[in-house]
């Protein structure tokens, strides 16, 4: 099965898959997740503050995004919006969709973490003369983010794998590069396994970074206790 020609193909194709991973998949993940954190934090704080009107809009956003497939969302933005005169290039379209999609899931993670902060923490803040915004920014949000860190890290790992869907809107990331090589070599099994191992390597690195981050946060928490 794995003859010399196939091994040669795998060795030759490796940099052709890794380079799109480093230049497209990773940047797409980093940019999208960074934006999703901004969205998620804002949406979570709106819900936590119980701002009428805005809270309902936040819940509607989360309901729609979590209730529809990511691939459908990509198609709506890239293939659907041009019919109403809104044209978005593939890479920005992928960033937009991944940010909005991940933002909905991360918003629920952060909201739950905010609600897990003891009420006494806020009361103590009021007692020393802090304003509501100061309490949120200096007391509640830092504790909530520490609690949410493991789940948010898992969301990053999931997004790395989800970026493979961007090939459906012509983003030249790893999966599209794999498909192009398969079209010339007719070796789908070996090449899909190869790109799968690259995704696995990326995910493993992120898991190690997550573990290091959790240890550092736990150490910081013990020092602050």
What are the functions of these language-model segments?
Residues 1-225:
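Transmembrane alpha-helices and adjacent helix-loop boundaries
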């Amino acid at each position: 099965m794995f003859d010399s020609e196939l091994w040669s193909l795998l060795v030759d194709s490796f940099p052709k898959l890794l380079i799109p991973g480093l230049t497209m998949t990773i940047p797409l993940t980093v940019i999208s997740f960074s934006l999703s954190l901004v969205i998620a934090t804002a949406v979570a704080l709106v819900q936590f503050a119980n701002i009428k009107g805005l809270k309902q809009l936040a819940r509607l956003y989360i309901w729609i995004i979590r209730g529809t497939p990511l691939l459908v969302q990509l198609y709506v933005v890239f293939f659907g919006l041009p019919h109403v005169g809104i044209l978005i290039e593939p890479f920005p379209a992928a960033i937009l969709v991944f940010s909005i999609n991940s933002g909905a899931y991360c918003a629920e993670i952060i909201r739950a973490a905010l609600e897990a902060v003891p009420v006494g923490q806020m009361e103590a803040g009021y007692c020393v003369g802090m304003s509501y915004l100061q309490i949120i920014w200096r007391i509640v949000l830092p504790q909530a983010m520490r609690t949410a860190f493991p789940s948010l890290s898992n969301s990053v790992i999931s997004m790395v794998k989800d970026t493979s869907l961007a090939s459906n809107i012509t983003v030249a990331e790893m999966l599209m590069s794999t498909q192009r090589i398969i079209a010339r070599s007719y070796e789908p099994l070996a090449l899909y396994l190869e790109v799968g191992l690259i995704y696995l390597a990326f995910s493993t690195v992120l898991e190690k970074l997550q573990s290091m981050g959790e240890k550092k946060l736990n150490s910081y928490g013990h020092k602050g206790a």
